[in-house]
């Protein structure tokens, strides 16, 4: 019993650490166009993408992401048929909550000091977020911060220079083996007073690679190998997948 109480206390401490990182938290309000700077509705608009459930799978190791992710900002025509993403002031437009990694470091849920929280982060600049409003696909480079008293505050899977590159589509994928094609879909469309909402979209991706861990263990990489062993990293393209159920709102401020 004492070990379980200690485990709960450590979870609380880790959550406080995660908040202290300054991670931009996903919003429960939908749609949320806070920070959208669109003024010319002919060439600009607001977007809010919030996930309802998600799974990130690395060689069979599954991490449920829950309702932890959001992309929010302004879309502007680039004059060549594409769209430029601008985040709300003071943010990068990508918002995430910390989620627990099943089994923690050692694969034993209740073991004191074992709990690991994962925070998905944008890897690089907001300009690298590419959104297609025709098919609701999203291209985005990410990295995942792992937070644990042993791992330290700088442990990451992926970096700005070597990210996990996701192309989340609503169509059918064409992955390298051993993965096989999977399909997403565009959800139901409805109107609201400031625009349109698509609910229940499914975006999928299973052609990406996942690099090994970096800076785990006091920021010195002392236990990168332990993290890689636990999460089966690095993992080549064709062994990983991500599926997200989300709602998308497009409109005016």
Descriptions of predicted regions:
Residues 27-253:
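Extracytosolic secretory-pathway proteins
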Residues 1-28:
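Secretory targeting and sorting signals
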């Amino acid at each position: 019993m004492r070990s379980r109480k200690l485990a709960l206390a450590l979870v609380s401490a880790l959550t406080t650490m995660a908040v202290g990182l300054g991670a931009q938290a996903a919003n429960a309000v939908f749609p949320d166009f806070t920070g959208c700077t669109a003024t010319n509705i002919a060439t600009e608009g607001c977007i809010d993408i919030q996930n309802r459930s998600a799974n990130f799978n690395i060689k069979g190791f599954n991490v449920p992401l829950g309702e932890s992710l959001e992309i929010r900002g302004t879309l502007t025509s680039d004059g060549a048929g594409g769209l430029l993403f601008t985040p709300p002031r003071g943010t990068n437009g990508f918002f995430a909550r910390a989620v627990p990694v099943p089994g923690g470091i050692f694969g034993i849920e209740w073991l004191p000091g074992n709990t690991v929280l994962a925070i998905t982060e944008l890897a690089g600049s907001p300009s690298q977020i590419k959104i297609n409003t025709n098919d609701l696909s999203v291209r985005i480079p990410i990295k995942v911060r792992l937070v644990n008293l042993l791992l330290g505050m700088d442990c990451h899977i992926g970096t700005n220079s070597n990210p996990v590159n996701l192309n989340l589509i609503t169509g059918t994928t064409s992955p390298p083996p051993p993965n096989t094609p999977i399909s997403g879909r565009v959800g139901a469309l409805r109107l609201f007073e400031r625009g349109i909402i698509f609910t229940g979209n499914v975006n999928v991706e299973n052609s990406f690679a996942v690099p090994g861990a970096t800076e785990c263990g006091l920021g010195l990489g002392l236990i990168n190998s332990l993290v890689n062993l636990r999460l089966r990293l690095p993992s080549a393209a064709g062994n990983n997948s991500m599926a997200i159920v989300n709602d998308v709102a497009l409109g005016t401020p």
